[in-house]
A protein has these predicted regions:
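N-terminal signal peptide c-region/cleavage motif recognized by signal peptidases
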Residues: 13-16
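Signature of short aromatic-glycine-proline-rich micro-motifs recurring in repeat-based ectodomains
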Residues: 46-54
Length: 147
């Protein structure tokens, strides 16, 4: 009986990891790759914050998608490994796909129940060199963006 109970618990834990962990695995791989890149550059020491991976339900299906924010990375031997004047890398993991962006800042806002990712991007993305430029991104029946 104990063996059956133990097997059931292991199976339940494993199934939740597989079902709910698909994006987590991708997010973790992104962070691990960054850690490896840091270490390979003059033996750098890699650090992240608790805000490195955040959860947001962009598709409205009740299952949160993940954002991996490289502005939360630091490497002791490089100040600009994951960004520069164009912004810092931001990865959004939706439906098994990784969307990569550069952004100076970002925020998720709710517009009538729809989660919208706002990115403050380099002004050249708005075809000029003056003032702020923003992108609004939504994932509803696919991926859409506007600048």
């Amino acid at each position: 009986m104990k063996a059956i109970l133990f097997a059931s618990i292991v199976l339940l834990c494993f199934s939740s990891t597989v079902i709910g962990g698909e994006h987590l695995t991708i997010a973790t791989e992104i962070v691990q790759k960054a850690k490896s890149e840091c270490a390979s550059f003059e033996g750098g020491k890699f650090n992240t914050t608790e805000q490195t991976i955040t959860l947001h339900d962009f598709t409205g299906d009740g299952r949160p998608e993940e954002i991996v924010d490289a502005s939360q990375f630091s490497c002791s031997t490089s100040a600009s490994m994951w960004g520069g004047s164009g912004g810092t890398f931001l990865w959004v993991l939706v439906d098994g796909k990784t969307h990569e962006f550069l952004a100076h800042k970002w925020r998720v806002v709710d517009v009538d129940g729809q989660k919208v990712l706002l990115l403050a991007v380099h002004s050249s993305e708005c075809s000029d060199t003056l003032g702020p430029c923003y992108r609004a991104l939504v994932w509803s029946d696919g991926f859409r963006t506007i600048r």
